[in-house]
């Protein structure tokens, strides 16, 4: 563990009181600012208090935090409750930033796609509080999601109204995205489309599409932009675009500490200062930094990523041409269209014509995706109906057995039906069972309603069981 800490000490800073101050002083001596992000898997209360302790330091004026850092593992069906709790718990941190002199900055980090709506909702609800209207704060958006430009436009509309009402502008930190593996796993496990762009070039194009939108003067006045990344072509493009449009003062260039430091220094000289993303971790909890380090290794190792060739860029014409061609292909693909997200499941509009049925060979039926607002509304309605549900009661009464003769008749009927079933071919039985599966799918809501009423099943528990029955 000690050897590993020494190997990656330039990427992650020791959060202990006796070492953090010297590290901050060293990183800021050239004029750079720091965005301090506390790594760790401690309970939410500890994460929040430690982040507050960091923000209260005289040498820290900018921190990052995630919704999950204060809510812990949360159930996405309980969207409203999680948002309300996160707002309640995060507000004192924002109040500390607002009451500091000068004001300090809090950046709300984005996690996986399933947290996109929730993070935006928490962010806007915190800053909608009247006593925080003059506080500038930030949020992260990930360009590898097709939904991101629409999310940026949503934030732009909200920020424009905020500024028009005398409030402060906000900041968006634009990144490519670093949770691809988790997005793939999430999609495969539940039978959902993977949320990210299908190719790296499409993600790069989306990054430039969002830069083009964000760096228009009428937008930049409401949202300051953090251009986060190490791709020198993208950095140069953003800088020249901002200068050409007269909004350079509304752009901040951001990089990770310890990554491509020579190139970062050249950019710092050109733009004035960099905002360095500084992960800090308590030495006793160093294991939690492994995930962060793995993501950095992936970025450096994959030939699709710019970082894989950054040290050969100036000396290897082939590497330079490769990156130049990638940049031009992505730039030439930029359009004004607002891409749609990859997931469109909506249980509210499901019917016999569009319910999922495998076209050929067996496929697991997709679970309900609670990251989509239509599905969450559908789930809320189920829970509300479950309080007074009467489903199945009439059927029970109609089929109640009141005598031994009725029981014997039922057994005889079942025996006769079994003989009919036995005469069916395999293909005929399969057709019947496929229809049964379809009918179960069409009655998913009713089944969940009864599960909740009779067994106290939560939506996340019941929904997967309905999917298993369909399969």
Region locations from a protein language model:
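Positively charged, amphipathic and often flexible ligand-engagement surfaces
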Residues: 1-359
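Terminal low-complexity tails and localization/encapsulation signals of metabolic enzymes
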Residues: 272, 283, 288-438, 442-453, ...
